[in-house]
C-alpha cells in the first residue's frame, strides 16, 4: 500500500463514529457509520470488537490505566488504524473496537505485555465480555463484514 493510500485510509478510519446512541447493543455494522471506508482503496481489514458489561463496582481508574497502556502499546506496534473507546451505558454495556491493517498486527499487539496485563484483570472489571472478529472487505463501494 502506498503512503498516499495508507494516509487516506487512516484519515477515513478516524471518521468512523457511532450512528446511534445505543451502538453498544447493535451489530457493529449498524451501530457505526463506516461510509468513509467506502471511498478508500484496500483489500481487507481486520476488526476486533470488545463487547462487555462492566461490574457496578468497577474501579474506573484501574480500568483506564490498563486500557491506556494497552492502547499505547498497540499504537506503537504498528497497523492500528482506529481505536474506538466506548462509554458504558446505564446498564454497564460497552462496545470498543480496534481496526487493524492485518490480523497478524492485531495478534502481535494482543501478545504485548500491557495487553496481557489488561486481560488478567478482566474478571475483576466485567460481569461478562465477548470478542467478535471480522474481516472487512470491499465489493465495489459496499463494505462486507465477515464475522470469523
Placement of each model-derived feature along the sequence:
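Short amphipathic alpha-helices and their capping/turn residues within compact interaction modules
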Residues: 75, 79, 88, 111-114, ...
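Short, flexible coil/linker segments at or flanking structured domains
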Residues: 35-38, 68-71, 88, 94, ...
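Short, well-ordered beta-strand segments in beta-rich or mixed alpha/beta enzyme
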Residues: 48-52, 83-112
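Alpha-helical oligomerization segments
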Residues: 97, 104, 108-148
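Short S/T/G/P-rich N-terminal loop/turn motif that feeds into the first structured element of a domain
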Residues: 1-86, 135-148
Amino acid at each position: 500500500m502506498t503512503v498516499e493510500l495508507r494516509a487516506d485510509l487512516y484519515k477515513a478510519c478516524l471518521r468512523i463514529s457511532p450512528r446511534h446512541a445505543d451502538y453498544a447493543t447493535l451489530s457493529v455494522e449498524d451501530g457505526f457509520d463506516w461510509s468513509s471506508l467506502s471511498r478508500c482503496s484496500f483489500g481487507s481489514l481486520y476488526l476486533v470488537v470488545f463487547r462487555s458489561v462492566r461490574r457496578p463496582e468497577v474501579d474506573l481508574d484501574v480500568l483506564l490505566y490498563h486500557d491506556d497502556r494497552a492502547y499505547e502499546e498497540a499504537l506503537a506496534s504498528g497497523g492500528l488504524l482506529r481505536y474506538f473507546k466506548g462509554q458504558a451505558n446505564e446498564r454497564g454495556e460497552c462496545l470498543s473496537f480496534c481496526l487493524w491493517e492485518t490480523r497478524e498486527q492485531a495478534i502481535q499487539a494482543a501478545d504485548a505485555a500491557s495487553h496481557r496485563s489488561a486481560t488478567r484483570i478482566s474478571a475483576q472489571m466485567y460481569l461478562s465480555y465477548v470478542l467478535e472478529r471480522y474481516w472487512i472487505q470491499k465489493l465495489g463501494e459496499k463494505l462486507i463484514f465477515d464475522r470469523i
